[in-house]
Regions:
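Intrinsic disorder/low-complexity segments
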Residues: 6, 18-21
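Alpha-helical and His/Cys-centered functional microenvironments
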Residues: 6, 14, 33, 153
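Short, positively charged and aromatic/hydrophobic N-terminal segments
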Residues: 13, 21, 25-33, 39
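PLP-dependent amino-acid enzyme catalytic core
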Residues: 28, 39-527
Length: 527
């Protein structure tokens, strides 16, 4: 059973409740709806690996990851959600509707959403949809750090603070592994937020110079940034190991949580821009309500594309979801064959946010496609951890391929797309977007439905790759290349990136992955 839904007239059944407070809260919601005569839904999340490990949405957001190492999940397809009604609303109201449905026990979601985004984005629409040739590009990078992560990480700090208050928790320590964009977006969202501390780990030499500069110059009294000798998978595995090692440990009243998309509070806000893009196409007269739209998503940790699948299960008429990968093509092989195998070379590419071999959010998809078979998911995850690979059943592969397409693109292919889009459409994109555009061309979705390519970062976050694609070569530092790219194309350098030059480096720590637990404990315990 994917999630527990409580409606008027139904008997209360809540497995695995561990606290009286949680039980009373469940009873309260049921009794209140009977007294008011209104029909409502109260949702409980549980681990992808054990449905007995349950949590209210606030607790799921606060903990970030389930006690057994699984991810908190419910089936959004079980929600009673008015998806057509929300299409008529402005972006802020739409976000409040969607987050209120996925995280129903948060108080005043409308106020929380509006406070989270106030003054942070270039426009109130947050994520403009731009026609480019015969396709559309959904620009997700107009927030404070010029990356799509801003959409979710503007909201997550307020969700965590609200959850801590409602749950009566102490200080929250946010642990985050980043392949580039999540780190700065999380730091920007959490810096100097009362009752929180944040620690960001990134692979040394595994992010772009601009991404690194964004992180190591971060100000704030509650922030720590540390490089790991290894790749992103090492950093992400290290964070998960810290969670496991700290289970049941006295942390002086602190609670560990995550800003990665393993946290449902990070994933849920990403669902919103799929609805926003669809609504924009309806308002532009490109489609009528009920007609399908295809989405092509540059994919690493599988959170962004999973948000699109959540939107589909909530009722949005999503057609195909195309998973675009770079040379680290583990997901392309998985969707094509049903075999997930991380035992392969790791490539550092011009699209570093996709340089991942272990896609954590795929676990939630496996849960949904297996119809909530926690034992099956737990077995696959154990095999992946033990042997480095697994193969799904023919039935699950059939379900996977009924929803997803895939394609991959190497650095040379991405550079060719960047050059061609500029020459033919006068549109400038970053390497991640170029990978997705290439995937859209390879899959050839030719049924007449609109194709939306998600653009996840400003081209100015990767000036060397973009300038190299346009001119065939480049030299100088990143900031000189930004200026050169500006002069060449006439496009504007985002102020948050231009302002990095000359800022003081505040974080210089570099450690081995085996040192992460001691590093975290020293910070948390104050030693």
């Amino acid at each position: 059973m994917q999630c527990r839904l409580f409606r008027s007239g139904q008997r209360i059944y809540v497995p695995g409740i561990k606290t009286l407070a949680f039980l009373l809260e469940t009873v309260y919601h049921t009794v209140s709806e009977k007294a008011s005569g209104k029909r409502s839904v109260f949702m409980i999340y549980h681990s992808t690996r054990d449905e007995k490990l349950t949590a209210a949405p606030t607790r799921a957001v606060l903990e970030g990851i389930a006690p057994d190492g699984g991810l908190y999940v419910c089936d959004p397809g079980k929600l009673d959600f008015d998806w057509q009604g929300t299409l008529q609303k402005d972006t802020m109201s739409m976000a409040a509707d969607i987050l209120g449905a996925l995280l129903p026990d948060f108080q005043d979601m409308n106020g929380l959403v509006r406070a989270s985004y106030a003054g942070k984005f270039a426009s109130d629409d947050l994520t403009p949809l731009v026609p480019v040739g015969e396709r559309y590009v959904l620009e997700l990078y107009h927030g404070p750090t010029s990356a799509f992560k801003d959409v979710a990480l503007s909201v997550l700090p307020r969700l965590v603070s609200a959850a801590a208050k409602q749950e009566g928790a102490g200080d929250v320590v946010i642990l985050t592994a980043t392949s580039g964009d999540t780190g700065k977006a999380a730091l920007e969202g959490f810096h100097d937020v009362s009752g929180t501390r944040i620690m960001v780990f990134y692979p040394a030499g595994g992010v772009s110079p601009v991404q690194e500069a964004q992180m190591v110059t971060q100000e704030g009294g509650n922030v720590r940034v540390c490089a790991i000798r290894g790749n992103f998978d090492d950093a992400q595995t290290g964070v998960k190991n810290v969670f496991a090692a700290c289970k049941g440990k006295d942390l002086h009243g602190a609670v560990l949580s995550s800003a990665n998309s393993i946290n449902i509070g990070r994933l849920a806000p990403q669902v919103v821009y799929y609805f926003r893009a669809y609504a924009d196409l309806v308002q532009a007269g490109r489609i009528r309500v009920g007609e399908k739209v295809h989405f092509v998503v540059p994919t690493g940790n599988f959170g962004d594309i999973l948000a699109g699948y959540f939107a589909k299960r909530m009722g949005l008429p999503v057609g195909r979801l195309v998973c675009a990968s770079n040379a680290n093509d583990v997901l392309t092989e998985f969707i094509s064959t049903g075999v997930y195998d991380r035992r392969r070379p790791f490539y550092k590419t011009t699209s570093p946010s996709m340089d991942i071999l272990v896609s954590s959010n795929l676990e939630r998809l496996l849960y949904l496609l297996s119809e909530g078979d926690c034992g099956y998911v737990a077995g696959l995850m154990e095999q992946l951890n033990r042997e480095g690979h697994y193969q799904v059943s023919p039935r699950l592969l059939e379900r996977l391929q009924a929803e997803f397409d895939c394609a991959c693109c190497d650095d040379a292919g991405a550079a060719e797309v960047i050059r061609r889009l500029w020459q033919e459409q006068h549109y400038l994109c970053d390497p991640h977007t170029a990978v997705a555009w290439s995937a859209a061309e390879q899959v050839r979705l030719e049924d007449g439905a609109p194709v939306v390519v998600l653009s996840t970062a400003s081209p100015y976050k990767f000036p060397a790759a973009v300038l190299g694609a346009l001119e065939g070569g480049c030299d100088g530092d990143e900031f000189a290349m930004m200026e050169r790219l500006h002069r060449l194309t006439g496009t504007e350098v985002p102020r948050n990136l231009a302002g990095l030059q000359g800022r003081t480096v505040r974080h210089r720590d570099v450690i081995d992955k085996e040192q992460m637990l001691d590093y975290v404990l020293a910070e948390v315990m104050g030693s």
